[in-house]
Amino acid sequence: MKLRKVLTGSVLSLGLLVSASPAFATSPSAMVKENNIVQDEISVKELHTKYIYHHNINDFKNIEKDENGRNWYLKGIEYKDGWYVGKYQANY
């Protein structure tokens, strides 16, 4: 009789242990991954705009260099009062 109680208790304990194990398991959907993002210092640049006038639309270049070596990028061309006006922008 004593052996039967021990055996029954052991089986019940094992059953509880097995049935409770999913509660202790972690699923991938429950995990939260934190990303540590390191940012370098960003230099603040200002957007500058200048306009160049030509009589011929073919005189515009996509990139104009100024006397300081900066690149000015053509953003658009409009026709006003007999002139083609090119809008150039640069960041510095």
Curated annotation (Swiss-Prot):
Keywords: Signal. Residues 1-25 form the signal peptide. The keyword Signal applies. It comes from the Bacteria. This is SPbeta prophage-derived uncharacterized protein YoqM. It comes from Bacillus subtilis (strain 168). The gene is yoqM.
